[in-house]
């Protein structure tokens, strides 16, 4: 249903009897107009147990605190929210976040915070490419920016367009992205252009770069955060460093890039500070722990990548004896025979 669709993403940790029924805890700490906010909630698949919003100007004070269906609101911070809380379950139930209800009734602070949270986007390059292709193809200025970024990335693309194919029998059309490349004769003289179907003819790296180009440009222009999973998996290491440098430059004061990556070359003190490098370590019970490099005591070396691969920071896989793997496979095949 519409009211609890936001809980559909919930999935408990199923590898432990202690956590399979336990609530999950989420919290965001962020700034709006140089004012610090802390918003969070505890939920399971069916119910909101706790929810809170704090603001810090001179000191941290509560905007609202929710326990079950009981909500205490500071009226001076959230006037419409205060009225909603007094009406209790007539306007919201245990499956709905109080902040979203206050937003739907146009509470000024709630709407501002929800608007900021909605700017926080997780980038799936393939989905982004399909969903946004009409947007950037119709916007010449935006398209020019994307083409410029692709040229800087040295992927060989001169232009991007689309072809539209119609089917009169079913009254439908399909559109396909195409890439425009320079074409040369045997003497390497430019003689025109050649086109490629993006989905089937371009490399995975080129498709990845196009897919993340629009979110990157949007984030840098609007000062919003983005999250990219498996960052660098399909891109050249020099290119991933350049992208990271864009967000880590002095010119960028608002936007934030958060990535999950196995590209250890990015663990470079010339590129990232220790407090900007986090690790996720999974133990033998399947539990994952997040910690930052700055929390690890006694680090004097700046060879972050080398030290990490040597296991000095943890968060490396426990690999078996691969030297004997071929023998083990052969033994299994012999047993099958």
Residue ranges and their predicted role:
Residues 36, 225-226:
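Hydrophobic "anchor" residues on beta-strands that sit immediately upstream
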Residues 1-7, 220-221, 250-253:
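Post-Walker A helix-loop "phosphate-sensing" segment adjacent to the P-loop in P-loop NTPases
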Residues 169-217, 221, 225, 231-235:
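Conserved ABC ATPase signature
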Residues 1-38, 44-48:
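Conserved P-loop NTP-binding catalytic core
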Residues 36-167:
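Electropositive, glycine-dotted interaction segments
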Residues 236-241:
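Short alpha-helix of the ABC ATPase nucleotide-binding domain corresponding to the H-loop/switch region
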Residues 1-13, 209-215, 245-246, 260:
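Phosphate-binding glycine-rich loops of NTP-binding sites
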Residues 242-337:
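C-terminal lobe/lid and adjacent interdomain/linker elements of RecA-like ASCE P-loop ATPase modules
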